[in-house]
Amino acid sequence: QRMESWLHKQVAKDVANSQHSRKTTLELGAGTLNQLKYEPAFHPYDIVEPFTDLYKNSPLLERVRNIYSDCSAVPSGSRYDRITSVATLEHVCNLPEVVARSGLLLAENGVFRASIPSEGTLFWALGWKMTTGLEFRLKHGLDYGLLMKHEHVNTAREIEEVLEYFFEEVRCKVFGLTKSISLYRYYECRNPVVARCSEFSNEKNP
């Protein structure tokens, strides 16, 4: 839990200062709304989350302005200062479409902020096998790796390649020593390549 909090804190770092806490936000894959614990309580916050059971009983739901079941459902005229995701991009089957649409939904000087596990690296595999994987096998007698193969459809490298295709500026920070020797990564993306985003999402940017 303590290590996983790194994922949340990196994404929320830009609004830690009250001067920037009014930024409009769209969170992709908001799940149980646990990222809201790290976010200011009074800035406009929209979410994309297809599974209503994850958040419907959350006491944090009152802080959410708009809820969308899919990124494509967000009105094309909407603009956000920040679009965020925490341990979500590795699960997204249509990742290029989602990132392209996000690029079009960013306001001028907006930032796409995403934290992910270092999926696809030996260090990450060893990490979960010795913790969650071991616990899962002892409790259920099943191989957690099979579940991971179905859940994590994108590696960290694949995610980075998609981000670099749709954004001119992509910065990466790791929870570890290097990209290959890390448990988690945080990406900060600026200046979307609008032509590529529009072409891939079949949407013209107004």
Please tell me what each predicted stretch does:
Residues 10-124, 186-192:
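Conserved SAM-binding loop
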Residues 2-5, 72, 93-107, 111-200:
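S-adenosyl-L-methionine-dependent methyltransferase catalytic module, highlighting the catalytic core
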